[in-house]
A protein has these predicted regions:
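Short, solvent-exposed micro-motifs at the edges of structured domains
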Residues: 1-213
């Protein structure tokens, strides 16, 4: 069989999922919680998946050993493509002097930036062995990301839920100071702003046995 799925979505919220453990719920301005409304950390605009299974018909050959060799095979695959996930850019430090560091933004909204896309193909080859009328054994060899595509991500926590997205925007090396405080403040973009610093898993291969009874 062959199945295809496509999702076009847009997710907005005013904070991380309540089930995400260890994620800060601090807002930039405690007097204006509505300003936190923006793209959700798990917002992904496009997602495409295709799955197929190929199981050839049974061949009736003259030699029994040939029948056992060419029959009872199955090949299946899942192809996944997803557009980039959301990233949040903040300023290192505490420019609004509220005592809460690493949550202040410039003029951008929360999760205003987008990371790199994702593409992966998984492949499985299965051989079915009939041990008895009630017992069957499946021999499987599977490969995840079989094409070994380098799926980059901006930082290791960028997985759609655990998404802090790093402090991309830093203080200028020559800020305007007043009594030791930054006012009004000059900022510069880090050289690594939105540059991928990590990657999802490369090609992986595993062999398995599954007993059905």
């Amino acid at each position: 069989y062959f199945r295809v799925g496509y999702t076009l979505s847009k997710a907005l919220d005013d904070g991380p999922d309540a089930l995400v453990v260890g994620r800060s719920g601090n807002v930039q301005n405690s007097y204006d919680a509505n300003a936190e409304r923006g793209f959700s950390a798990d917002d992904q605009r496009h997602r495409f998946t295709a799955a197929w299974v190929a199981e050839p018909r049974k061949f009736e050959l003259s030699q029994s050993w040939l029948n056992g060799l060419v029959n009872h095979w199955k090949l299946s695959s899942i192809v996944t493509f997803g557009s980039g996930r959301r990233l949040n850019a903040t300023i290192a430090g505490d420019p609004n002097q509220d005592g809460n560091t690493y949550n202040d933004r410039l003029t951008n909204s929360r999760n205003a930036f987008t990371g790199t896309d994702y593409f992966s193909t998984d492949l499985r080859l299965t051989r079915n062995l009939k041990l008895s009328d009630r017992v069957k054994l499946d021999l499987l060899i599977e490969s995840f990301n079989v094409t070994n595509r380098t799926n980059k991500r901006v930082e290791i926590s960028d997985d759609g839920f655990f998404n802090s997205a790093g402090q991309f925007v830093a203080y200028s090396t020559n800020p305007v100071g007043m009594n030791g405080k930054y006012y009004p403040g000059q900022y510069q973009v880090n050289e690594t702003f939105l540059e991928p610093t990590n990657a999802y898993a490369p090609r992986q291969i595993q062999i398995a046995l599954r007993l059905n009874f």
